[in-house]
C-alpha cells in the first residue's frame, strides 16, 4: 500500500523567516547620487595614482601607502600599479636585519609581500628572538609592532614555527595590554583579536578601518574622503544587484511553495559579495547568488524535509537533468526542479554568446556530485548510521558545498577559461584545503543544533567515536585541521603558481566568508540575527557619513 502524506514523518527544522521581507525590492536606485559620486571618485583616483607612481617615494613610505589603500578598500583601483611597486621592492632584497626597520615595519612588509604572492622568508623575524628561543620581553610594550606581527602571522605556511610562536606571543600580549592602549590603536587591537585581517571579509574590514583611520592623527584627509566616496558608490551598485536578485527570488515564489526551506537570498548575496566586491564582477555576483540560493533549498530538502523514497527520485532527476523527469517527482519539489533547469538554461544561453558554454557544463556536473553526496548523507541519517570519520569526511567535503560554489563563482567571470574549471574538477590541494575549512568550521558551529534534531552522522560524533575523544578534544582537533588548511592555502597563493590568481582569490575569499559567518561558533547563515545582520546593514543599508 502506498505511503500516505499523513503517515510520512519528516525531519522538519523550523527555520526562522527572512529578516528582510521586501526591504531590498523597494530599492531607490539613486542614479543621480551615483553619477555624482562616480565623477568625484574619478577625480580623486587620478591624484592617488600620482601618489603611488611617484618615483621619489621611499620603501617605507610607499609600503605604508599601499597598506593604507588596501585597508581603506580602494586598492582595487590600482592593482596593476601596486603589483609593479611590490615586484620592484621585493627584488631589492632589502636587509631587514638593519635596525632601521622596526617590528611594525618588518611585519607589515612581510604581510604585504605574502598577500601578493611573494615568497619572503619568515627568518626576518629572528632578530626578535632571545637566547631561549622566545620572543623578547621588551616587545611587550610595543602595541603597534605586536599588532603588525599578529596580522603577519596569519599568512604563515606549514613548518614556520617562528610564526606559530609569533601568533601565540602576540595574541597573549595584545589581550593583556589592549585595555591600556590609547584609541584608535586600542580599537584596532580589539577588532583584530576577534577578526584577523587575513581571515576577514575585505568590505567589512574596509568599513571598520575607515572609522579607525578617521581617528588617526596622521590620517590623509584626501585618502579618507576617497575611501568614503568609493565605499558609498560601491554600496549603491551592490544595492542595485541585491534589488535584482531579491526581485528574481520573489517572482520565483519558492518561499511559499517550499516553506520548509531557509529564506536567505539576502544572506546569499552577502556571501557572493564576499567572493568579489569589485564593480567588474557584477554579473558574477548575481549568478553566484542565484546558485547559492538554489543550493540552500536543495540542502534543506535533503536535510530537513524529504524522505528517502522522495530523495531517491529527486537524486535521479538531478542526475538525468531533463525536464521530462518532472512527472516522476513529488509535487512539492516540481516547481523547484523546473526553476533550477530554467536558471541553467539562461546561464548557458548567456555564456554561449561569449564562447564559454563549457562553464555551465562544469557547474552542472559539480551540482550532480553535490546532490549524490547529499543523498548519501540523508541515507546515513535515516538509517541511523554513523560512518568512520574518514568515510564521513570524504563525503562531507562535497556536502559543504564549496566545491560547487567555487565552480559557480567562475560562471560570470569572463577571464575564467576552461583550464580553470578543469583544475577545480581535479580537486587540487588549495581547493581541498578550502573544503576542509568550510567543513570543520561548519561542523563545530552546527553540532549542538543537529544533535537536538537527532542528527547522528555528524563529523564531531564520528571523530569522538573513532578516537574515544571528548567533545572538547574533537572541537580542538577540528580547529587544528582548519589552521593547517589555512597554512596550505597561504602556501598555494605564493608565486610561482601555474594557476590564475583570479581563481586563487575566489577560493581565499570563500574561506574568509566562513570565518565571518561562523564567528564565535555561531551558524550565522541559519540564524543571521546576531552575526550577519550588522554586517548586512553596514554593507547594503547605511552609507558612510561624509
Curated annotation (Swiss-Prot):
Named cofactor requirement(s): Mg(2+)
Binding site for Mg(2+) 2: 299, 303
EC number from the UniProt entry: 4.2.3.199
Keywords per UniProt: Lyase, Magnesium, Metal-binding
Keyword Membrane recorded: no
General function of this protein: Sesquiterpene synthase that catalyzes the conversion of farnesyl diphosphate to (-)-5-epi-eremophilene.
Name assigned to this protein: (-)-5-epieremophilene synthase STPS2
Extent of motif DDXXD motif: 299-303
UniProt key word Metal-binding: yes
Binding residue positions for Mg(2+) 1: 299, 303
Quaternary data: Monomer.
Gene that this polypeptide is encoded by: STPS2
Binding of Mg(2+) 3, residues: 442, 446, 450
Classification via InterPro entries: Isoprenoid_synthase_dom_sf, Terpene_cyclase-like_1_C, Terpene_cyclase_plant_C1, Terpene_synth_N, Terpene_synth_N_sf, Terpene_synthase-like, Terpene_synthase_metal-bd, Terpenoid_cyclase/PrenylTrfase
A Pfam family matched in the record: Terpene_synth_C
Note on how the cofactor is bound: Binds 3 Mg(2+) ions per subunit.
Family statement drawn from the similarity comment of this UniProt entry: Belongs to the terpene synthase family. Tpsa subfamily.
Record text about domains: The Asp-Asp-Xaa-Xaa-Asp/Glu (DDXXD/E) motif is important for the catalytic activity, presumably through binding to Mg(2+).
Pathway info: Secondary metabolite biosynthesis; terpenoid biosynthesis
UniProt xrefs under CDD domains: Terpene_cyclase_plant_C1
Reactions listed under catalytic activity: (2E,6E)-farnesyl diphosphate = (-)-5-epi-eremophilene + diphosphate
SUPFAM superfamilies assigned to the protein according to its UniProt record, in alphabetical order: Terpenoid cyclases/Protein prenyltransferases, Terpenoid synthases
Amino acid at each position: 500500500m502506498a505511503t500516505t502524506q499523513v503517515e510520512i514523518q519528516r525531519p522538519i527544522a523550523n527555520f526562522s523567516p527572512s529578516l528582510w521581507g521586501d526591504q531590498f525590492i523597494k530599492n531607490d536606485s539613486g542614479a543621480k547620487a551615483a553619477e555624482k559620486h562616480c565623477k568625484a571618485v574619478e577625480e580623486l583616483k587620478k591624484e592617488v595614482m600620482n601618489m603611488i607612481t611617484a618615483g621619489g617615494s621611499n620603501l617605507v613610505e610607499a609600503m605604508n601607502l599601499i597598506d593604507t589603500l588596501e585597508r581603506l578598500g580602494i586598492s582595487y583601483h590600482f592593482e596593476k600599479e601596486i603589483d609593479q611597486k611590490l615586484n620592484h621592492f621585493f627584488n631589492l632584497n632589502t636587509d631587514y636585519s638593519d635596525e632601521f626597520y622596526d617590528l611594525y615595519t618588518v611585519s607589515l612588509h612581510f604581510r604585504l609581500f605574502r598577500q601578493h604572492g611573494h615568497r619572503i622568508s619568515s627568518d626576518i623575524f629572528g632578530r626578535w628572538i632571545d637566547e631561549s628561543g622566545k620572543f623578547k620581553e621588551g616587545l611587550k610594550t610595543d602595541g603597534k609592532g605586536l599588532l603588525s606581527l599578529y596580522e603577519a602571522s596569519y599568512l604563515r605556511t606549514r613548518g614556520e614555527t617562528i610564526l606559530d610562536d609569533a601568533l601565540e606571543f602576540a595574541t597573549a600580549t595584545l589581550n593583556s595590554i589592549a585595555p591600556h592602549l590609547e584609541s584608535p590603536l586600542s580599537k584596532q587591537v580589539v577588532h583584530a583579536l576577534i577578526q584577523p585581517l587575513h581571515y576577514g571579509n575585505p568590505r567589512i574590514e574596509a568599513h571598520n578601518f575607515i572609522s579607525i583611520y578617521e581617528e588617526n592623527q596622521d590620517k590623509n584627509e584626501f585618502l579618507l574622503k576617497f575611501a568614503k566616496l568609493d565605499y558609498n558608490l560601491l554600496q549603491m551598485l551592490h544595492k542595485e544587484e541585491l534589488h535584482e536578485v531579491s526581485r528574481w527570488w520573489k517572482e520565483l515564489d519558492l518561499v511559499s511553495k517550499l516553506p520548509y526551506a531557509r529564506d536567505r537570498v539576502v544572506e546569499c548575496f552577502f556571501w557572493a559579495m564576499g567572493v568579489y566586491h569589485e564593480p567588474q564582477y557584477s554579473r558574477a555576483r548575481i549568478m553566484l547568488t542565484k546558485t547559492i540560493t538554489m543550493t540552500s533549498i536543495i540542502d534543506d530538502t535533503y536535510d530537513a524535509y524529504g524522505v528517502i523514497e522522495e530523495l531517491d527520485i529527486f537524486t535521479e532527476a538531478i542526475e538525468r537533468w531533463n525536464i521530462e523527469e518532472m512527472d516522476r517527482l513529488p509535487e512539492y519539489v516540481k516547481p523547484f526542479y523546473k526553476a533550477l533547469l530554467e536558471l541553467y538554461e539562461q546561464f548557458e544561453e548567456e555564456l554561449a554568446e561569449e564562447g564559454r558554454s563549457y562553464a555551465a557544463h562544469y557547474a552542472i556536473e559539480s551540482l550532480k556530485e553535490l546532490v549524490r553526496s547529499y543523498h548519501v548523507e540523508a541515507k546515513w541519517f535515516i538509517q541511523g548510521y554513523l560512518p568512520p570519520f574518514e568515510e564521513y569526511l570524504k563525503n562531507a567535503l562535497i556536502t559543504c558545498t564549496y566545491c560547487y560554489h567555487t565552480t559557480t563563482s567562475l560562471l560570470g567571470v569572463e577571464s575564467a577559461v576552461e583550464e580553470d574549471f578543469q583544475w577545480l574538477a581535479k580537486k587540487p590541494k588549495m581547493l581541498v584545503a578550502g573544503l576542509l575549512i568550510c567543513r570543520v568550521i561548519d561542523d563545530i558551529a552546527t553540532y549542538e543544533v543537529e544533535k537536538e534534531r537527532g542528527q547522528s552522522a555528524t563529523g564531531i560524533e564520528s571523530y569522538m567515536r573513532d578516537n574515544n575523544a571528548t567533545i572538547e578534544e574533537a572541537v580542538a582537533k577540528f580547529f587544528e585541521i582548519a589552521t593547517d588548511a589555512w597554512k596550505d592555502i597561504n602556501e598555494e597563493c605564493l608565486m610561482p603558481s601555474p594557476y590564475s590568481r583570479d581563481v586563487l582569490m575566489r577560493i581565499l575569499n570563500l574561506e574568509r566568508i566562513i570565518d565571518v559567518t561562523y564567528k564565535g561558533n555561531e551558524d550565522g547563515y541559519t540564524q543571521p540575527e546576531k552575526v550577519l545582520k550588522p554586517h548586512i546593514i553596514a554593507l547594503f543599508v547605511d552609507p558612510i557619513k561624509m
